[in-house]
Amino acid sequence: MSSTPKQTTGDALAGHTPMMQQYLRLKAEAGPLLLFYRMGDFYEMFYEDAERAARLLNLTLTKRGNSNGTPIPMAGIPVHAMEQYLARLVALGESVAICEQIGDPAAAKGPVERRIVRIVTPGTLTDEALLPAKADRALAAVCVTGKREPRAGLAWLNLASGAFHVTECAPAQLESELHRIAPAELIQAESAELHMAFEGARTRVPDWHFEADGARAQLLAHFKTDSLGGFDVEDMPAAVCAAGALLRYAARTQSQALAHVQTIAAERSGQYVLLDPVTRRNLELTQTLSGEESPTLFSLLDGCRTPMGSRLLRRWLHHPLRENEPVLARQHAIATMLTARQEGEQTFAAAGLLETLRDALNAFPDIERIAARVALRSVRPRELASLRDALAALPALHASLTPLSGSPRARELAAQLAMPPDIGELLARAVASEPAVAIRDGGVIAAGFDSELDELRALATDGGDFLVQLEARERERTGIGNLRVEFNRVHGFYIEVTKGQTDKVPEDYRRRQTLKNAERYITPELKTWEDRVLSAQDRSLAREKWLYEQLLDALAQYVRPLSQCASALAELDTLAALAEHARRHDWVAPELIDGAEIDIEAGRHPVVERAIERFTPNGCRLDQTRRMLLITGPNMGGKSTYMRQVALIALLARTGSFVPATRARVGRLDRIFTRIGAADDLAGGRSTFMMEMTEAAAILAASTPASLVLMDEIGRGTSTYDGLALAWAIAYRLLTHNRALTLFATHYFELTRLPAEQPTAANVHLAAAESAGGIVFLHEVREGPASRSYGIQVAQRAGVPAAVIRQASRELERLEAQGAPTPQLGLFAAALDADVQSQAMTEQAEDAAALAQLRDQLVAIDPDSLTPREALDALYRLKQHLT
């Protein structure tokens, strides 16, 4: 590999060409980042950067001569294709420094002036082409402070929208919080040791970035204030440190202040229903268990008409609310949108109001991200055109909201849509109806906006009459009937004469280009006119660029109202999508109460019911008198689906959505836990059973009477007795100590005796029936325990060979004839005295120790070396040990 020269000062650069000296200085500034070095129509990379980029992007690796006596490896990409290459590099976890030409090549005596204008990292993407439309890509920073009582401060910024949040938690909760936020990049101090799983990119910055005084000063300077009291973060010192470091890093990547970041939102621990990473995965909120994006709860509900709405819906699903008031505000807004609901019925008629609202939302682009790019001065001309058209569509949207005035939240959102009329008028006057893709192409500023630009454009483009007249005069003057006056980008304007007519060319014709069948000439008159036209084109483009910068300056004052408008549009879109789904699929508004309770009548799994022809609805009741359901039944009977169904209905209710049921009542929940299925964590060195116990331990440690807990087949990864003992003990602990609302599925039928001892537990089962053709799963939840598990019948349906099925059936009959082993049945007998249990365990331990000692004595005996007398003595000693 060719290493980049590291010394960038003094004599170390003397042997390099001036251009390479400039490159090496900029590369030293970029550090380990890939440096895209602008040279004309290409971004070039040299030395290790070239070799790395060639490998990652499959580019051709060439050489750019020698500098300081050594060859220079080089690879490049076209400027117009930069975004697609950037996307590939960011997807690979790379960060890129982009160096642009900012000087005038014509005026430069040496290398044209260049500087790094921005840094692109996985967490600082703002370009539309690099961002996922329906998901956020946040940049996060973490800081752990305190030794006796450590606290983890977490800050995260969505640079593409300007949303800036902070929170604090215990260090043990940090991994769960990061999973909730799902940042693309995490910033941490160089010396920080964070032992946690994180799939995104990690970036280390100097420790002093996280120092309290410097971080606070960074925030105060950015928000132009003397105190952080107005942001409600004064009691979050660790979060303030993280926020200051994050803001410093983000501003450096953009090479400018972040004008669209205008506030900090402090999140408190009691704000949301907490979902740990296992629960988010098991409930398949936005990703299936196999890692696919569909079918998930999000893909099912996402009927949003704007990308902003889709992103907000995703955030709502990952952040269900704990308090009822904001949930009821959303729910009431959805109900108001469904004004065509027929009284006393569970179905919805066609809602013309809702369709009108959703049609109006179709007219809106991603204003949230456009506003951010306006602030960052990276907005493209066509985005401004789409913003202009969107502002023109606001009155129609306002009109469609008038019937929703009965909803306080809808009224608030309608008021938030109001925009100053000046911005719409400015964009309508300034931006061409169909602008070019980039400002460098011209044609962006509308005709009539600037008289000087109009004059330059006329001079540059209205030369058609002159060329026609010149061609006619030259034909008459030379007698060459097929003479033509034309233009191309390489040679400019020229007069073309065929080879057979060149003897008629006048003396004032100067040859410009020779072709196979023609010669091309220039005359003094045509040259003078060409200079004037090309100069006008250059001046026109320069004027247009200047006007575009002035336009961005004028738009900067509207970033805040644009962001507020985008936020209102996103929420209206999300509410309308949820309302439309409720209307189409017979969902109902759940009743929200203060106590911890879940009461569902004829509930349905929102995703599964759309995937099968007929879904069997089931109810569920969990409250103060019925805190645990012990669920038994056959494999494939629907236990896991039923449990997920209950959790998803509860989660939907806490987001403000309607739910798939005929009636539902859901109380205030603080957490939702799931332990449904498991797989080996090979990378972490943990078996399935270890994973299962780790998840169970987390649930037992953190669940409360306001938690919903789903436990599926706990204890199955070990021996029967161990598994049964653990399952019983875990269920008993959840019921009597944690007192969480629990769905506990099991194949250990001994556990069905628990309700006899603890009245707040109840047995239910998934029904099945046997027929001549085998087992039939009814998928109905019925009261009471199951009578059997039908494991052999399920194996038969799975295609296990008939001989194996017959042998298994015979073995089952033999085991059933023997009856259940006494120790297993008696293991949890309520009348069993605790002292007897303790004595039995002590005796077992003593027996085990004696057997171990006996084994050691036997191993120590070498029969070949013993005399008959010694052998007889050894035998007596062993007999004495046994008796």
UniProtKB/Swiss-Prot annotation:
GO terms for cellular component: cytosol. ATP binds at G633, P634, N635, M636, G637, G638, K639, S640. The keyword Chloroplast does not apply. InterPro entries: DNA_mismatch_repair_MutS, DNA_mismatch_repair_MutS-lik_N, DNA_mismatch_repair_MutS/MSH, DNA_mismatch_repair_MutS_C, DNA_mismatch_repair_MutS_clamp, DNA_mismatch_repair_MutS_core, DNA_mismatch_repair_MutS_N, DNA_mismatch_repair_MutS_sf. Pfam families: MutS_I, MutS_II, MutS_III, MutS_IV, MutS_V. GO terms for molecular function: ATP binding; ATP-dependent DNA damage sensor activity; damaged DNA binding; mismatched DNA binding. Keywords: ATP-binding, DNA damage, DNA repair, DNA-binding, Nucleotide-binding. SMART domains: MUTSac, MUTSd. GO terms for biological process: mismatch repair. It comes from the Bacteria. PANTHER family: DNA MISMATCH REPAIR PROTEIN MSH1, MITOCHONDRIAL, DNA MISMATCH REPAIR PROTEIN MUTS FAMILY MEMBER. NCBIfam families: mutS1 (TIGR01070), PRK05399.1 (NF003810). HAMAP family: MutS (MF_00096). This protein is involved in the repair of mismatches in DNA. It is possible that it carries out the mismatch recognition step. This protein has a weak ATPase activity. Belongs to the DNA mismatch repair MutS family. This is DNA mismatch repair protein MutS. It comes from Bordetella pertussis (strain Tohama I / ATCC BAA-589 / NCTC 13251). The gene is mutS.
